[in-house]
Amino acid sequence: MPHTLWMVWVLGVIISLSKEESSNQASLSCDRNGICKGSSGSLNSIPSGLTEAVKSLDLSNNRITYISNSDLQRCVNLQALVLTSNGINTIEEDSFSSLGSLEHLDLSYNYLSNLSSSWFKPLSSLTFLNLLGNPYKTLGETSLFSHLTKLQILRVGNMDTFTKIQRKDFAGLTFLEELEIDASDLQSYEPKSLKSIQNVSHLILHMKQHILLLEIFVDVTSSVECLELRDTDLDTFHFSELSTGETNSLIKKFTFRNVKITDESLFQVMKLLNQISGLLELEFDDCTLNGVGNFRASDNDRVIDPGKVETLTIRRLHIPRFYLFYDLSTLYSLTERVKRITVENSKVFLVPCLLSQHLKSLEYLDLSENLMVEEYLKNSACEDAWPSLQTLILRQNHLASLEKTGETLLTLKNLTNVDISKNSFHSMPETCQWPEKMKYLNLSSTRIHSVTGCIPKTLEILDVSNNNLNLFSLNLPQLKELYISRNKLMTLPDASLLPMLLVLKISRNAITTFSKEQLDSFHTLKTLEAGGNNFICSCEFLSFTQEQQALAKVLIDWPANYLCDSPSHVRGQQVQDVRLSVSECHRTALVSGMCCALFLLILLTGVLCHRFHGLWYMKMMWAWLQAKRKPRKAPSRNICYDAFVSYSERDAYWVENLMVQELENFNPPFKLCLHKRDFIPGKWIIDNIIDSIEKSHKTVFVLSENFVKSEWCKYELDFSHFRLFDENNDAAILILLEPIEKKAIPQRFCKLRKIMNTKTYLEWPMDEAQREGFWVNLRAAIKS
């Protein structure tokens, strides 16, 4: 029994391991370039079977806890390894021994409490290393990075347990593009620990407290170009000149991000910055000022020289006691050399006139996402304010009148670039006043419905994108760039109004087509962006866009953003890939050809009808059918005549004086039906013919040249023809009054021609001795 249980347990373990292995393999996908992705796949270990084909391996956000020597042994060509946000607590000494080609290694946010230099010794090609967020207290007992001669980006430290920086920690590193140290809970800093690095382009330092800030500052000031301080409480910071000593500063930019500061500590920070002789740029992002702007120096403090600072950037500054804020008059003297100022999303509603007048060197001012209105802007742009200002950005404020805004800026004589986008102007007056040197104007997202002469003629760049424009007809003779995307325009602007245009961006409008002639009319155009419109892919448009090879050089978003909207069967397809059928592309020619063919068919039908009497056939058929459809007055009708005589009026003498006399005076007499005598007056002649033929036992045709030429004889012959065809009888008797060729009888009377070919007909003899026999034969034929 125990043996059986043991076997069951072993089998269960094997099955469990096989399932886990198959699950690991299923969570990893690799492409043909060796890029393998297995992030967020619930992996418990590094998948087996990895080969030298793998070049990039992403296993972030899994449950991996252990890396063995064999896991990555075959990945000799691996260049990037991402293992962030797992549960890794152990890495065997030689786990990375075969990764000589590795350039990018991310081990951040795991559970590595001890770091080993043996991990990194084989990584001679490493340029990026991230060890942030692991619970180590120090960076190991020996130097970790001394063998990483190609390292450019290094990130180390954590928020809670990293408490000590030692001199050996960064030994061997001479140049770094970026060094990020999370020393939020730093308690000990060994002097000159960071001084060993000769040059750092960008140092990011996370520190909750400022206790060790000056010591670190002394070490990095001569090697760091951009120093960024994050998440630091400087409310009680105090600068001591003795702590810095003589320094040869290399710092050009100092950034404070998510830093707390007071009026007094800001003054102390400025004293610190005064030690950086080459400082050019100062930036405050997401900072909190716990003060009211009272930056007055104490009697013991000397006046601060701002040095060479040219750029000041403030973004999302939070001032809890905003309503008590001062006028900044104590800082006026420090601003005269500043050339670029950005104060963004910081609730600025006014720049005092005196401050504006002190900003004598200011060339660029960005007050985006604030509370500026025309009345306060007028005070800010007072006489002699911002005398050197060239660019003013007032994006997303509370401006509402273009006319007032333009008039307010007239005092700025050197102003050339104005961005007042994302304000709500809605309408535009017919005329406005602007500074004389205006070259650039941004009116995007201002809800305007039309553009007028308010736009200055001196502009070289105009942005009116994302509005409600359906027409652009301004004459701007100097305009070089026009941005008018996301409007409602249905066609390209008139090129004659924009003779100098180089760049036109008109994507996502209501344009359905444009032609070669339109583009050629823009003589100087170099760049056109017209994608995202609802193009009608007509044959002309397709021919133009697909045959012009040079068009791709002008259309910067070709071909991806040029899609057909119609015809419906090509909707959504790229214009360059659409091919229309011949019938769609040559519809006019096709319709014309069909009309010509139809005309020729009708003409041919007419000729054939005329040649073969088709019209006559139809007329006779119609008359016969009409006659057949007439209701009978009696269910049956008796034969009233022995024969109906059809003859030509020119043969009337022979019929009336010879034939009638011989037949009607015979004993017993024959009763003949003659049209002159027996037709009912007032009745339709066709009806008379049909009725007479139907009431007659026989129909006698007196054939002669006159008969063939007679129209009424033709009718009588016609209806006799129909009767022969309809009733299939032999009621017709043919008399040849004079010799006549069978060809003289119209071919349309095929039945009668057949009778003449198959049956004997009577011929009027010229010899009087034979005429008695003729009458005997005729009487016999009528009686038969």
UniProtKB/Swiss-Prot annotation:
| Glycyl lysine isopeptide (Lys-Gly) (interchain with G-Cter in ubiquitin) crosslink residues | K754
Domain TIR as annotated: residue spans: 639-782
Q: Which Gene3D superfamilies match?
A: Ribonuclease Inhibitor, Toll/interleukin-1 receptor homology (TIR) domain
Q: Ranges in the Extracellular compartment?
A: 21-587
Concerning InterPro entries, the annotation shows:
Cys-rich_flank_reg_C, Leu-rich_rpt, Leu-rich_rpt_typical-subtyp, LRR_dom_sf, TIR_dom, Toll-like_receptor, Toll_tir_struct_dom_sf
Q: PTM per UniProt?
A: Ubiquitinated at Lys-754 by PPP1R11, leading to its degradation. Deubiquitinated by USP2.
GO CC annotation: cell surface; cytosol; Golgi apparatus; membrane raft; nucleoplasm; phagocytic vesicle membrane; plasma membrane; receptor complex
Summarizing the function annotation, the protein's role is:
Cooperates with LY96 to mediate the innate immune response to bacterial lipoproteins and other microbial cell wall components. Cooperates with TLR1 or TLR6 to mediate the innate immune response to bacterial lipoproteins or lipopeptides. Acts via MYD88 and TRAF6, leading to NF-kappa-B activation, cytokine secretion and the inflammatory response. May also promote apoptosis in response to lipoproteins.
Give the family from UniProt: Belongs to the Toll-like receptor family.
User: What name appears for this protein in its UniProt entry?
Assistant: Toll-like receptor 2
Species of origin reads Gorilla gorilla gorilla
Name the encoding gene, please. Answer: TLR2
